[in-house]
Amino acid sequence: MLYHLLYPLAADYKLFNVFKYLTFRSIYAMITALLLAFIVGPWVVRKLEALQARQVIRTDGPESHLKKQGTPTMGGVLILVCIVVPTLLWADLKNVFIWLTLLIIVGYGVLGFVDDYKKVVEKNPKGLSPRQKMFWQVLLAAGVGIFLFYLPGFSTELYLPFFKRVHPELGILFIPFVTLVIVGASNAVNLTDGLDGLAIGPVAINAGTYLLFCYIAGNARLSGYLQIPYVPGAGELAVLCGAMVGAGLGFLWYNSYPAEVFMGDVGSLSLGGALGTLAVLTKQEILLVIVGGVFVVEALSVIFQVGSYKYRGKRIFRMAPIHHHFELKGVAEPKIIVRFWIITIILALVAISTLKMR
């Protein structure tokens, strides 16, 4: 919005020329999101408490979690506001990639909100059924995949970080692949969101990493030099990534241990979906497995646990997702959280290093 209102004035006032720079708008989208979280956050927490939108703690989990009983949840509403508003303010709203990503963020956010509302406000412990959630997740993600498949000039090849000359053509399989990436990322972040700040920290780091890749992918000269796919228009997504980083840090202010508020499904589903969409739009889907390694391991721990118990009658971990396994082994919650952040930072550096690996 500000881009469209103020950049045209650059012809008369050179000051407004800064609005053409992605770096400027990305930084200020981040700052706007952060300030918005600081200003609106306390009101959101109070409102959630007034609605009695309180987290229900599982009795079969670690005993230390029982003290979290009654902590407000659905704080992901704050995250969504802090992403959407700065993006609308600072991004080029003529860019179709911005609207595709916002579609997933808002769509998955609404889905998570309905699920949370049924659980914590209507006191329906089941919320939406897994089948209902999966249906809407797949529908939205497949819609993005179909749109991109028919979008003129958008490549349906698969690019590999370490093998830049190898990029197989997916053809029609591109649509289910996109669906898998977006839905998988969404649910992986959802499974990770089990400790104070455990999910939002890595999400912010992932968003910061993709900010860099979005900027490079949208720049013909840089992408050509670094031999990564050039995606015209992808650079504008750096503004949205900046808003995600700011929103993540702003929410962490309230979600850090001991948490004043939890994000709920409204936050985790939408953030994971956003990361998956960014990976698809920048043609860096495999990179998400690296930088989002914590989310991948959390999801795989659940898959292996369920599979092992179903077919062998034995559990691999004391409890899944794996962060609960470490809790039951006696590792303090803050230590688990910080260690997972450290791992994510290392993985982000590895992901960035692939820019120079051929």
Curated annotation (Swiss-Prot):
Membrane topology classification: Multi-pass membrane protein
Example of a GO cellular component annotation carried by this entry: plasma membrane
InterPro entries assigned: Glycosyl_transferase_4, PNAcMuramoyl-5peptid_Trfase, PNAcMuramoyl-5peptid_Trfase_CS
Subcellular location: Cell inner membrane
UniProt keyword annotations, A-Z: Cell cycle, Cell division, Cell inner membrane, Cell membrane, Cell shape, Cell wall biogenesis/degradation, Magnesium, Membrane, Metal-binding, Peptidoglycan synthesis, Transferase, Transmembrane, Transmembrane helix
Name of the top EC class for this enzyme: transferase
Disulfide bonds: none
Domain of life: Bacteria
GO biological process, one term: regulation of cell shape
Main localization of the protein described in the UniProt heading: membrane
Catalytic activity: UDP-N-acetyl-alpha-D-muramoyl-L-alanyl-gamma-D-glutamyl-meso-2,6-diaminopimeloyl-D-alanyl-D-alanine + di-trans,octa-cis-undecaprenyl phosphate = di-trans,octa-cis-undecaprenyl diphospho-N-acetyl-alpha-D-muramoyl-L-alanyl-D-glutamyl-meso-2,6-diaminopimeloyl-D-alanyl-D-alanine + UMP
Pathway participation: Cell wall biogenesis; peptidoglycan biosynthesis
Record-annotated membrane-spanning stretches: 24-44, 73-93, 95-115, 134-154, 169-189, 197-217, 233-253, 261-281, 286-306, 335-355
CDD domains per the UniProt record, alphabetical: GT_MraY
Entry GO MF terms: metal ion binding; phospho-N-acetylmuramoyl-pentapeptide-transferase activity; UDP-N-acetylmuramoyl-L-alanyl-D-glutamyl-meso-2,6-diaminopimelyl-D-alanyl-D-alanine:undecaprenyl-phosphate transferase activity
Family note: Belongs to the glycosyltransferase 4 family. MraY subfamily.
NCBIfam families to which the protein is assigned, alphabetical: mraY (TIGR00445)
Job of this protein: Catalyzes the initial step of the lipid cycle reactions in the biosynthesis of the cell wall peptidoglycan: transfers peptidoglycan precursor phospho-MurNAc-pentapeptide from UDP-MurNAc-pentapeptide onto the lipid carrier undecaprenyl phosphate, yielding undecaprenyl-pyrophosphoryl-MurNAc-pentapeptide, known as lipid I.
UniProt name for this protein: Phospho-N-acetylmuramoyl-pentapeptide-transferase
Natural source organism: Geobacter sp. (strain M21)
